[in-house]
Swiss-Prot record:
SUPFAM superfamilies in the record: L domain-like
Protein name listed in UniProt: Leucine-rich repeat-containing protein 58
Pfam families given in the database record: LRR_8 (PF13855)
Assigned keywords, A-Z: Leucine-rich repeat, Repeat
SMART domains named among the record's database cross-references: LRR_TYP
LRR repeat locations: 14-34, 35-56, 58-80, 81-102, 105-125, 128-149, 151-173, 174-195, 197-217, 219-239
Entries under PROSITE patterns matching the protein: LRR
Length: 349
């Protein structure tokens, strides 16, 4: 029987949909193994990597998706020119890969549809990685070490059990596409607005508002918030705990510009006064420390969306300087319907 041949003249060895449980790559001549740059093995019944796979010394792409693999052996470490590893829909988890995998110069890693409960440390060592897909797994968190993937442009973590977004994502200078849909995320850290390269953001989760800093994502072209319990009417949440005497004194000092120097106050009070936040209402000029009013305002974004953003005010008497106005009880039905349509652009992505 003749061995499998390189197909299409494109340095591709295609062994897809053959129902193979074992594969003898020695049937491929040594010269042809050196020519092959793409090895396609999806939709078989492979449990482990075929023996001698590391003899494909010029391999750039390896596709082992839709098999029965629970373990990737050290043979993969011999594929020193490998750029793309596709292993979707297997039985892989965080213990399935050799510790030295981080030494490969991978650029694309797609492991969606597996059994990962956390992102393995060795994945977070691949600084050449541009695309990481771990959708449809069992991830519960995104590690802070995600910031080590300094070349990352595309991150797909949809369909997991993630409950929070680490602020360290803001340290990825080239991140352009971020997909976190179908998780359990309830809030977005304001640091995410520092990812100025972000062009597409998918957040179908449990969000009720967005931080106002999101408006600084001027490169954003796609924003999908479908399925979130975002409020669709203007919401005034004025639950307010009166400020302490310490805060009242601090507000008075900062608002009235009362002079003080380090020799006059204890160190803890000096540090406290440095924590003052300015009220966003330009007509107010006040400050707050620990006690503030949280208020949701709808703000026009990119001329297309009305986003519910969180504002922090110094007191209930203060009104937020948001450009958009609230829907009052006297709004006409047509105006209310128009607002609903604008919100639908966000809710439906």
């Amino acid at each position: 029987m003749e061995g499998p041949e390189v197909t299409d003249g494109d340095n591709v060895l295609n062994l897809t949909h053959l129902g193979l449980e074992n594969l003898n790559l020695e049937l491929v001549s040594e010269n042809k193994r050196k020519d092959v740059q793409q090895l396609l093995l999806p939709h078989n019944r492979l449990v482990v990597l075929p023996p001698h796979v590391n003899s494909f010394t010029h391999l750039h792409l390896l596709d082992i998706s839709n098999n029965n693999m629970a373990y990737i052996g050290e043979e993969i470490l011999g594929l020193t020119k490998l750029k793309t590893l596709l292993a979707k829909n297997n039985r892989l988890d965080e213990f399935s890969f050799p510790k030295e995998l981080g030494g490969l110069r991978l650029e694309v890693l797609n492991l969606s549809g597996n059994r990962f409960e956390e992102i393995p440390d060795q994945f977070l060592q691949i600084q050449t990685l541009k695309s990481l897909s771990l959708g449809g797994n069992r991830l519960k968190s995104i590690p802070a070490e995600i910031e080590n993937l300094i070349s990352l442009e595309f991150l797909y973590l949809g369909g997991n059990f993630i409950s929070s977004i680490p602020p360290e994502l803001a340290n990825l200078p080239y991140l352009s596409y971020l997909v976190l849909c179908d998780n359990r995320i309830q809030s977005v850290p304001p640091q995410l607005a520092q990812v100025h390269s972000l062009r597409s953001l998918s957040l179908h989760n449990l969000l009720t508002y967005l931080p106002r800093e999101i408006l600084s994502l001027v490169q954003l072209q796609e924003l999908s918030l479908r399925g979130n319990p975002l409020v669709v009417r203007f919401v005034r949440d004025l639950t307010y705990t009166p400020p302490t005497l310490l805060e009242l004194a601090g507000r008075t000092v900062k608002s009235r510009g009362i002079p003080y120097c380090p020799q006059e106050l204890p160190e803890n009070l000096l540090m406290y006064l440095d924590l003052a936040s300015k009220c966003p209402n330009p007509k107010c000029g006040g400050v707050y420390f620990d006690c503030c009013v949280r208020q949701i305002k709808f703000v026009d974004f990119c001329g297309k969306y009305r986003l519910p953003l969180m504002h922090y005010l110094c007191s209930p008497e203060c009104s937020s300087p948001c450009g958009s106005t609230s829907q009052s009880e006297s709004d006409s039905e047509d105006e209310a319907n128009a607002a609903a349509r604008r919100m639908q652009k966000v809710l439906l992505g």
